[in-house]
A protein has these predicted regions:
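Feature captures the catalytic ectodomains and active-site-proximal regions of enzymes
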Residues: 1-244
Length: 244
């Protein structure tokens, strides 16, 4: 199997771990990735083979400018134009029968940087109850503004959960991570995951954002985000064509 990713993320720790068993094909432009993909489809080294091609531009424009912006719309249009010109057309001419699946790994919720609730600023009383590392620094934040995970001292967990549930009423759900594990949100939770994951998670409602503030380190500048459990984030498209 082959993974085509932007050279900006192809060699990240996450990519190396997730794609360890595949051949990584870094690219500088999406059009060049599609050209390489077609070449591989027309001249496979072995069959069957699988190719995964990831385009981050649509996601990036959504984050930076919002999903109602022209930047986002143009990124979607440009994506399909490039696919038509650099994938569909040359592949049709080749006569190769290649099954193709299109999907987005998530949707998005609009968020407003100016209306983001910064948990540590809004409720500083919870800070002493959070776990710290060996250097005495609070273990926060984890996740994102759409799924903020907190490492709470076990003896304070229920107290903090109850406090935040009241304070965030109408803004977010506050859920024990163990409850989500039992309900299958993390699949089969490995022992390592259970040891490392935070024990409390804040899941903002649609259009809400809850994050952590540290100037020039942790700030919320996005106009759309994902990670929560709203249908707009969780549901996606899946287009399958048996062959071109």
């Amino acid at each position: 199997s082959y993974v085509f990713q932007s050279d900006k993320i192809a060699h990240s720790s996450y990519s190396k771990a997730l794609c360890a068993a595949a051949t990584m094909v870094p690219y500088t432009t999406f059009s060049s990735a599609l050209d390489s993909l077609v070449d591989l489809c027309c001249n496979p080294k072995q069959t069957p083979f699988y190719c995964f091609v990831y385009l981050a531009d649509i996601d990036s424009m959504g984050h930076r400018y919002g999903i109602a912006s022209d930047f986002f719309s143009n990124a979607v249009i440009d994506c399909w134009k490039l696919i038509e010109n650099h994938y569909w057309t040359p592949l049709r001419k080749s006569g190769k029968r290649i099954a193709t699946l299109f999907t987005a790994d998530h949707g998005m919720s609009p968020v407003d940087p100016d209306k983001t609730l910064y948990l540590n600023n809004s409720f500083p009383s919870i800070l002493p109850a959070l776990k710290k590392d060996t250097q005495g620094r609070i273990l926060a934040p984890s996740g994102s503004c759409r799924d903020l995970f907190l490492h709470v001292q076990e003896e304070k967990l229920l107290e903090i959960a109850s406090f935040l549930e009241k304070k965030l009423k109408g803004i977010a759900d506050v859920v024990l991570t163990k409850k989500m594990m039992k309900e299958g949100f993390f699949g089969v939770a490995s022992e390592r995951l259970q040891q490392r994951i935070a024990n409390l998670v804040i899941l903002p409602y649609y259009k809400e954002a809850v994050w952590w503030f540290e100037k020039n380190r942790f700030e919320q500048h996005f106009f759309a985000a994902h990670g929560g459990l709203t249908p707009q984030e969780m549901e996606s498209i899946c287009l399958f064509l048996p062959h071109v």
